[in-house]
Amino acid sequence: MNGIQVDINRLKKGEVSLGTSIMAVTFKDGVILGADSRTTTGAYIANRVTDKLTRVHDKIWCCRSGSAADTQAIADIVQYHLELYTSQYGTPSTETAASVFKELCYENKDNLTAGIIVAGYDDKNKGEVYTIPLGGSVHKLPYAIAGSGSTFIYGYCDKNFRENMSKEETVDFIKHSLSQAIKWDGSSGGVIRMVVLTAAGVERLIFYPDEYEQL
């Protein structure tokens, strides 16, 4: 056949990506996770209202960045392992969940595009945050940020984060941080979703663009 010949294997795959802004922050009563909601395929916005905050156990949640398919699959596998762990040993700790994430990400690091933040609450350790970047290492931190939009807010977060903030202060901190990430990062946008984990249980919050764009 005459005409232009194209090597399909050399074309970039149109993988759906959570090019994103995610974070989790400990505060005096627990921990709060936050994320934007834009999903992209290259320069195309595939979904404006994606939920990047995923439950893996009652009070253990994760923020997902990287390949949407990879991170959804990992979260599903971790949820299965934690349910199995619960039936044998009782309620898992946040550290246990982070270890399962780390094992999966490290063992498959050459095949996955996944950056995960794991956060949870239990009566013994209270609120905890673990970040698992590309490659599968794990780091416990008082707060963590990740995704393409995080590049723009490292300075802001470092200056404004304080330990033992109140719930209201922490929600405000996350809202301000993610609003700046969304402002400067083309792969971040949509609504800001949050999950609050405390002794009282799980609370979900959502903030629309008209509530944060003027910050």
Curated annotation (Swiss-Prot):
**Reactions it catalyzes:** Cleavage of peptide bonds with very broad specificity
Q: Which residues does the entry assign to the active site, renumbered to this chain?
A: T20 (nucleophile)
**Lineage: superkingdom:** Eukaryota
PROSITE patterns xrefs: PROTEASOME_BETA_1 (PS00854), PROTEASOME_BETA_2 (PS51476)
- InterPro entries from the UniProt entry: Ntn_hydrolases_N, Pept_T1A_subB, Proteasome_bsu_CS, Proteasome_sua/b, Proteasome_suB-type
Q: Name one Pfam family in it.
A: Proteasome
The residue stretches assigned to a coiled coil in this entry are none
Could you state a single Gene Ontology molecular function term? threonine-type endopeptidase activity
Identify the enzyme class. Answer: hydrolase
N-acetylmethionine modifications at: M1
Protein EC: 3.4.25.1
Name the GO cellular-component terms. Answer: cytosol; nucleus; proteasome complex; proteasome core complex, beta-subunit complex; proteasome storage granule
Q: Where in the cell is it found?
A: Cytoplasm; Nucleus
Q: What Gene Ontology biological process does one annotation of this record name?
A: proteasomal ubiquitin-independent protein catabolic process
Residues annotated as transmembrane: none
Q: Does the keyword section mention Nucleus?
A: yes
User: Chief subcellular site?
Assistant: cytoplasm
Q: Which SUPFAM superfamilies match?
A: N-terminal nucleophile aminohydrolases (Ntn hydrolases)
Propeptide residue ranges? 1-19
> What job does this protein perform?
The proteasome degrades poly-ubiquitinated proteins in the cytoplasm and in the nucleus. It is essential for the regulated turnover of proteins and for the removal of misfolded proteins. The proteasome is a multicatalytic proteinase complex that is characterized by its ability to cleave peptides with Arg, Phe, Tyr, Leu, and Glu adjacent to the leaving group at neutral or slightly basic pH. It has an ATP-dependent proteolytic activity. PRE3 and PRE4 are necessary for the peptidyl-glutamyl-peptide-hydrolyzing activity.
Q: How does it assemble?
A: The 26S proteasome consists of a 20S proteasome core and two 19S regulatory subunits. The 20S proteasome core is composed of 28 subunits that are arranged in four stacked rings, resulting in a barrel-shaped structure. The two end rings are each formed by seven alpha subunits, and the two central rings are each formed by seven beta subunits. The catalytic chamber with the active sites is on the inside of the barrel.
| Misc. remarks from the entry | The side chain of Thr-20 acts as a nucleophile, and the N-terminal amino group acts as a proton acceptor. Present with 7250 molecules/cell in log phase SD medium.
Instruction: Give the UniProt family note.
Output: Belongs to the peptidase T1B family.
What's this protein's name? Proteasome subunit beta type-1
Q: Which organism is it from?
A: Saccharomyces cerevisiae (strain ATCC 204508 / S288c)
